């Protein structure tokens, strides 16, 4: 039987300060799983040096690194969807490039998947380096979302997760423009297990989630999940 393959999907938007260090840690984590793997970067319209660095990585690591690029900024959720559309793996792992979600947790996620989980989602026990305002609004948002949803959505989670291929295939059949991965994952009803962790501070640079983008994501989540 052929060994199962893993796809790591990383949306990128103006991340030249952290990209190369992030790649080193991501690649080390994927190698530690012992599985064949691919790392898929989706450039979400960056206009700094991000794309140049991505081209360098693809040229230096042609067997494992693949790069796709949008003509403009379409948003995090559509960038993730693009990566999923092109992924070949038996399991798909979604992670942000900024190293707040430690790549070193990936081998543990893979082990939980091999033990039977269809979805392994990161559950944040603590959020380092975030302002009181950000922590408070996040807490209010997740509880509001949970109270309005027609189905249970785990609290204090983001898009850091592993999806079995069958889960990804169902997700990709749903082509809504306003996408909300964590809610859609919960709605599908597959076996999902949490992996608890402490979310780190950003390794470099600033968050690209402006207040406007956060409000839009919140609205998408509430409208997609409400009964």
Where are these regions (language model features)?
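Flexible glycine/serine/alanine-rich "lid" or loop that lines and gates the nucleotide-sugar donor pocket
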Residues: 187
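A general structural signal marking secondary-structure boundaries and capping sites
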Residues: 16, 30, 117, 148, ...
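Structured catalytic core of nucleotide-sugar glycosyltransferases
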Residues: 1-131
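Histidine/lysine/aspartate-rich catalytic loop segments that bind and position anionic ligands
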Residues: 190-192, 198
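Alpha-helical membrane-interface segments at transmembrane helix boundaries
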Residues: 219, 223-227
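Acceptor/aglycone-binding surface of glycosyltransferases and processive sugar-polymer synthases
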Residues: 56, 68-86, 100-184, 200-219
């Amino acid at each position: 039987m052929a060994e199962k393959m893993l796809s790591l999907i990383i949306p990128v938007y103006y991340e030249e300060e952290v990209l190369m260090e992030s790649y080193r840690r991501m690649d080390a984590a994927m190698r530690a799983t012992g599985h064949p793997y691919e790392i898929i970067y989706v450039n979400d319209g960056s206009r700094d040096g991000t794309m140049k660095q991505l081209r360098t990585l693809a040229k230096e690591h042609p067997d494992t690194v693949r790069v796709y690029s949008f003509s403009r900024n379409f948003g995090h959720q559509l960038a993730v969807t693009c990566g999923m559309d092109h992924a070949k793996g038996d399991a798909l792992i979604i992670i942000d490039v900024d190293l707040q979600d430690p790549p070193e947790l990936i081998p543990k996620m893979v082990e939980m998947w091999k033990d039977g989980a269809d979805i392994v989602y990161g559950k944040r026990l603590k959020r380092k380096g975030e302002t009181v305002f950000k922590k408070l609004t996040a807490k209010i948002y997740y509880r509001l979302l949970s109270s309005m949803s027609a189905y249970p959505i785990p609290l204090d989670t983001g898009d850091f997760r592993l999806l079995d291929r069958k889960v990804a295939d169902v997700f990709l059949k749903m082509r809504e423009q306003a996408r909300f991965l964590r809610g859609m994952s919960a709605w599908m009803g597959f076996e999902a297990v949490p992996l608890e962790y402490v979310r780190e501070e950003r390794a470099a640079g600033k968050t690209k989630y402006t207040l406007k983008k956060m409000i839009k994501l919140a609205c998408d989540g509430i409208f997609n999940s409400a009964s």
